[in-house]
């Protein structure tokens, strides 16, 4: 039995799906920038922070070995990255605001390791959890359990 989602749950789930897509796009964009730089012999440590710092440094220097076209493309990709960050932050803020007003989210966030995003995603997916007889049922539903529930 799967409970019908409330309109609020559906809205929250949509926010999570959109945020997840934006995060995937940002990761792909960062990897694309990394690839462009690597093709030109410029290596950057893994992670968004080193890449952002390297991109700012590269674009702030006078033209060097990078062609004007690549500099322009890198600048445009940097702008795309900023727009994605802005949208991700806006949706994350909205999710956080909704989670602060939800008692189920607040309860879940008392569990060590569960933050706003995880708690609100769980509430969006399963509501208050009353549809499960025991914790194992939830684990089986979320595919986090290695043994099937009989």
Where do the PLM segments sit?
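A polyampholytic, Gly/Pro-enriched intrinsically disordered region
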Residues: 1-2
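Phosphate-backbone recognition surface of nucleic-acid-processing proteins
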Residues: 107-150
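Glycine-rich, often acidic, oxyanion-interacting loops/wings at catalytic, nucleic-acid
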Residues: 5-107
């Amino acid at each position: 039995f799967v409970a019908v989602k409330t309109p609020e749950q559906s809205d929250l789930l949509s926010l999570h799906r959109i945020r997840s897509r934006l995060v995937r796009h940002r990761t792909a964009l960062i990897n694309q920038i990394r690839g462009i730089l690597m093709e030109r012999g410029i290596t950057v440590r893994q992670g968004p922070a080193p890449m952002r710092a390297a991109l700012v440094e590269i674009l702030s220097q006078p033209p060097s070995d990078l062609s004007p076209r690549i500099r322009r493309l890198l600048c445009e990709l940097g702008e795309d990255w900023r727009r994605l960050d802005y949208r991700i932050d806006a949706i994350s803020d909205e999710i956080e605001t909704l989670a602060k007003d939800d008692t189920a989210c607040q309860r879940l966030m008392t569990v060590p390791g569960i933050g706003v995003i995880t708690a609100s995603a769980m509430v969006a997916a399963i509501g208050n959890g009353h549809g499960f007889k025991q914790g194992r049922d939830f684990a089986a539903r979320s595919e986090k359990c290695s043994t099937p529930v009989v």
